[in-house]
Amino acid sequence: MKIIARNKKALFDYSIIERFEAGIVLKGSEVVALRAGRANLKDSFVRIIKNEIFLLNSHISLLHTTHSFYKHEERGARKLLMHRKQIDKLLGKVSIEGYTIVALDLYFNTKNKVKATLALAKGKNLHDKRETLKKKQADLEARAAMKNYK
């Protein structure tokens, strides 16, 4: 499993409830760009439109070798492939309980297919974010102390 892009900001801004795997509908030039590692999920989000699920605002850069006829939209909407039951479950959680769906990472699976890890998440408050930073800092200090102890 080769990870192409990771959304680190999502792990900081949201508390993850449940993770899902989804396939992505891509054009050939997009797959070539992903193989070169030219993807960014920083400001991306997932929406359900007419019972179909889309990854919006994800950035896949163009390669300079791509012919102008085959160029793709860098920030276009990309359809995600999931089972109907999973989409219905996500739709129910998002509409009723106020959760959001966030893309965590893009990767190539063992069959060289591009997959996305999605998460059902709840937004963190400012004090939750501060608490996360404090935990992270405490872990770093503990590791440093253990390293110096040896």
UniProtKB/Swiss-Prot annotation:
Main localization category: cytoplasm
Localization, UniProt: Cytoplasm
GO molecular function: RNA binding
InterPro entries named in the record: SmpB, SsrA-bd_prot
Keyword Ion transport: no
Superkingdom field: Bacteria
Presence of the UniProt keyword Iron in the record: no
GO annotation, cellular component aspect: cytosol
GO terms (BP aspect): trans-translation
Alphabetical UniProt keywords: Cytoplasm, RNA-binding
Family: Belongs to the SmpB family.
HAMAP family: SmpB (MF_00023)
Function as written in the Swiss-Prot or TrEMBL entry: Required for rescue of stalled ribosomes mediated by trans-translation. Binds to transfer-messenger RNA (tmRNA), required for stable association of tmRNA with ribosomes. tmRNA and SmpB together mimic tRNA shape, replacing the anticodon stem-loop with SmpB. tmRNA is encoded by the ssrA gene; the 2 termini fold to resemble tRNA(Ala) and it encodes a 'tag peptide', a short internal open reading frame. During trans-translation Ala-aminoacylated tmRNA acts like a tRNA, entering the A-site of stalled ribosomes, displacing the stalled mRNA.
Name of the protein in its database record: SsrA-binding protein
Encoding gene per record: smpB
